[in-house]
Amino acid sequence: MNLVLMGLPGAGKGTQGERIVEDYGIPHISTGDMFRAAMKEETPLGLEAKSYIDKGELVPDEVTIGIVKERLGKDDCERGFLLDGFPRTVAQAEALEEILEEYGKPIDYVINIEVDKDVLMERLTGRRICSVCGTTYHLVFNPPKTPGICDKDGGELYQRADDNEETVSKRLEVNMKQTQPLLDFYSEKGYLANVNGQQDIQDVYADVKDLLGGLKK
């Protein structure tokens, strides 16, 4: 079962990804985890990636793609994988196609969790964090018992600077522009499966399981 998971910030990718890997026994592979592992193991590509990251620069595609190729060639990917955060561009998607063709592991589905922008705005701007213990709340989905106060220690709750409406709106616009060509690419390939992410978490996952039902575990 070879899957790519897509969705805008706040769509619930992390939650659905955790459930998929738990139920189907495949590794959850994120770009960040791959970079960290390659740097920790001090592979040639990992060291090259580190040299860019240490300078605050973007890691070039050829290095990222090389790290992805190494990761997908490991034994735990024999029965499949869930890729999260890669690919981000059509060029990366084309490179991934070549890697998977070489390994004989074609993509089964690209699962895109769809959520309207106004719903994402509500989800992302409603987050509040305790200034003392760091516990995260949400004004709509997980509010504190007393507004503005942490249930655990009475600490004052604050909103992160990058959770304000203007910043979140800009971030979503950038993500939407970057993601659309990728969705078009996978739609043309016949891999794309859109899932309604505006339902309850359990209902979203029920739709994901229905989609994956025809695939071997």
Curated annotation (Swiss-Prot):
Induction: By superoxide. Residues 126-163 are annotated as: LID. CDD domains: ADK (cd01428). It comes from the Bacteria. Keywords: ATP-binding, Cytoplasm, Kinase, Metal-binding, Nucleotide biosynthesis, Nucleotide-binding, Transferase, Zinc. AMP binds at T31, R36, E57, L58, V59, G85, F86, P87, R88, Q92, R160, R171. GO terms for cellular component: cytoplasm; cytosol. It catalyses: AMP + ATP = 2 ADP. ATP binds at G10, A11, G12, K13, G14, T15, R127, T136, Y137, Q199. Zn(2+) binds at C130, C133, C150, D153. Pathway: Purine metabolism; AMP biosynthesis via salvage pathway; AMP from ADP: step 1/1. The keyword Magnesium does not apply. Its EC number is 2.7.4.3. Optimum temperature is 45 degrees Celsius. Thermal denaturation midpoint (Tm) is 47.6 degrees Celsius and is raised to 66.0 degrees Celsius when AK is complexed with the inhibitor Ap5A. It is found in: Cytoplasm. One of its GO terms (molecular function) is ATP binding. Monomer. Belongs to the adenylate kinase family. Consists of three domains, a large central CORE domain and two small peripheral domains, NMPbind and LID, which undergo movements during catalysis. The LID domain closes over the site of phosphoryl transfer upon ATP binding. Assembling and dissambling the active center during each catalytic cycle provides an effective means to prevent ATP hydrolysis. Some bacteria have evolved a zinc-coordinating structure that stabilizes the LID domain. Catalyzes the reversible transfer of the terminal phosphate group between ATP and AMP. Plays an important role in cellular energy homeostasis and in adenine nucleotide metabolism. This is Adenylate kinase.
